[in-house]
């Protein structure tokens, strides 16, 4: 929960519903972009028994949790429901929801549901093994996390659900539907299904037809910031919002996060440091990576696309290290009243740049067409406890995350011609002052850190405000509301050192992938169908 002693003179407020992988939040903002209050609840996406890789999205429980968050946010803000001028929803991407022909939700899965591994392989073989390339050239997506293999899985194993299905949306659209009763998708989130055209920002039914799937389940497409409907009497009773409150189209979490960071113009670059690290570059026109290493998504800004290269489990790796090895530091941080990561950063700051040559092996650079990683490990450890200890390993992890990030950005620059002149660093990772400086040193460009680091909800609130005329436009409002906390200038003395570390890491990582290929080690993560 977060609360600020600030009010909007008019008494107008906006609500964002943010459905993340691990939790759902209802966040209230004033019109100046200040967060007033937030209600939050964790949720779990449980596997279906005897369905390997499944990650079911519990529609009933998760709506109840959302309603709980809305009521909590209103209570903490000490606001009547009538103060909320509009609401919009955003969510993790790739997660889909199916509805029957009467509009009732009947099935859903979360973002990294991997049950359809066999179906991915099956679809890849279509058109003389050229179907995935056709999908990518149209949508900027591969089959790895797209909706088509999941629909094919339903046709194979749950034909009852497949036959009943009348409409498909994303999870953000499901929240909007539960509030308003209306069904539509926005391009930024629906683009991750692999069934939306990057240029027209509309569905491509022929892709489903080529896969032998039904193309009659595609809902209307409405741009982010468009009025969808109004809170129904039933929804008002369940969640505590006022009946008749406008419900506005939201979108995908990363794209709305970029809006909240003011990353709205071609050439701008952001690194969003959460569980995954997303390296995002706004492209001047829809183009694709000829090597198919990078995904291309519609931005929430009409006509704009984003190249997105993902580092896998970066934040999760840091949490694992903290919880597995730093019990002492957690207790000390608690006694000092500081965050454990801050304490670990203070320790790591005393370690020389380069971390004595220790090489973490966790996420690879994104290879979207053949997406898998080596087994987690540390390479080149020393038995000297003065040089090889928790502080060294923690610094090595931060440096490696920055190296992978720089490689991902270089990969985007290679096919797009767009090279970052500065980077906006946001998300939980941006709280680390040492990490922010390391990112600047490794990338060689200034790194700007915003005041609001979890910007997705703010971007979603901006969409809500645009939808009811409280703001003029998405891009202008995003630029106006973002405020900067600090900027980090690259230390040129570290450039050659980190370049050498990157070259060494790339060579070692290639060898480590070979161990996975031989079946000697287990991949950190492997995309369905590999």
Curated annotation (Swiss-Prot):
Keywords: Cytoplasm, Kinase, Transferase
Location in the cell: Cytoplasm
An annotated GO BP: carbohydrate metabolic process
Stored Pfam families: FGGY_C, FGGY_N
Broad class of enzyme this protein falls into: transferase
Predominant cellular place of this UniProt entry's protein: cytoplasm
Keyword Kinase: yes
Record field: catalytic activity: (S)-4,5-dihydroxypentane-2,3-dione + ATP = (2S)-2-hydroxy-3,4-dioxopentyl phosphate + ADP + H(+)
Tagged with keyword Kinase: yes
GO cellular component: cytoplasm
Disulfide cysteine pairs (residue numbers): none
Enzyme Commission number, as recorded: 2.7.1.189
GO MF term (any one): autoinducer-2 kinase activity
Protein origin, superkingdom: Bacteria
Function, in words: Catalyzes the phosphorylation of autoinducer-2 (AI-2) to phospho-AI-2, which subsequently inactivates the transcriptional regulator LsrR and leads to the transcription of the lsr operon. Phosphorylates the ring-open form of (S)-4,5-dihydroxypentane-2,3-dione (DPD), which is the precursor to all AI-2 signaling molecules, at the C5 position.
Family: Belongs to the FGGY kinase family.
Protein name in UniProt: Autoinducer-2 kinase
Species the sequence originates in: Yersinia pestis bv. Antiqua (strain Angola)
